[in-house]
Amino acid sequence: GVWHRTKLRTFDKGKREHGDDLIPCPFTTDTKQALFKASDMDINEELLHHPENDPAYLGLKVNQGVAAQPMVNPNLRRVARRTYTVDEFVEGILRSDITCLSQAVTLVESNRPDHQAIAQQIIERCLPYAGKSMRIGITGVPGAGKSTSIDTFGMHLVKQGRRLAVLAIDPSSERSGGSILGDKTRMEQLSREKNAFIRPSPSAGSLGGVARKTRETIVLCEAAGFDTIFVETVGVGQSETAVHSMVDFFLLIQLAGTGDELQGIKRGIMEMADAIVINKADGDNIDKANLAATHFRNALHLFPPTESGWRPKVLTYSGFYGLGIKEIWDMVDEYRHFATDSGYFEEKRQRQTKWWMYESINEALKNSFYQSDAIRSLRPEVENDILSDRLSSFVGAQRLLDAYFKSLK
């Protein structure tokens, strides 16, 4: 088409403006010549030829669109999600219905009071069927290959006939509060297995890198018949020790040549680990991985004996190539037999249950404090006093606490 502005109407790249509709206008050579000629003189309607009025273009019309085509598969039509009762949730979980399990986990993670009430009923009904799995916490530095390793570890277990649930905790943004939840995309093989359940969850700012509701989610997964539970944590470093309070075996994934061997001398996440495994021990990196393993073994000698009496081991493997995977799981099975025979396995679980009870109390008290009307009205005043140096932070905190306790009377 051509561009030509006239006093009557606008032609734009082969389209004519006609009311609110744009109609394609194929211009002939004669039309173009007439238009360019008309641009040099006063516009005359006789010189402006409209091809849409030409009998040769009787088929030219505005396409108003067509109706939606019928669906090939009517079952794909979107329907409203059905709301299950507590009894239906429990029955579905006990027969390993993944849909019921997923929706129940969503209720557990929800902050809505009505969802929390339903979730607590489901958890109480599922408790008698829980506790029969091996809970394994997996953590490590960012980029150590945790998700890829879980994919390889999981395939090894599924081939042995085990049922695996992976709870992947994804870091939430401090700015937006959002989370990518993309860990499942790096578990390509495992995500296709019917005996594997992968549930990414946001950390939601939870200290320790473990989502607050992970403990309850473990109960639901165990009731659904999963005999092995992986808890993959954010991997933020030494502050991530909360995972130790909800798992039976704590696996720390490290890399060679990153300087992390020196961190072994410090207290922290290292002394929590029941085993340290060096990933990416393949190709030209094998010698570096073996050297790093030696450094970690030397560092572990500086720690006091563990409560269980188990001596943490250091192994090397390659998650990408699947090398050394069998040796790692032989070590995990060895630990379980060791802890079960000594009675430490059951003792640790009882201690964890009590610890989480007090953690739940702390969380409930904190929520009650911040949701109090007395605190909401007093907080701005106390904050202003602190910022203008009229009060110290400790005195301001005590003033808020006094107001809260007074409101309870």
What are the residue ranges of the model-derived segments?
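Nucleotide-state-sensitive switch-loop elements of NTP-binding domains
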Residues: 88-95, 103-133, 144, 153-239, ...
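Hydrophobic anchor at the beta1->P-loop junction of P-loop NTPases
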Residues: 136-138
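Non-catalytic terminal/linker segments enriched in charged/polar, low-complexity residues
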Residues: 33-128, 376, 380-381, 397, ...
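Long, well-ordered amphipathic alpha-helical subdomains in the mid-to-C-terminal portions
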Residues: 101-103, 316, 327-405
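Hydrophobic positions on the alpha1 helix immediately C-terminal to the Walker A/P-loop
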Residues: 149
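P-loop (Walker A) phosphate-binding loop of NTP-binding proteins
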Residues: 141
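Canonical P-loop GTPase G-domain recognition
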Residues: 282-335
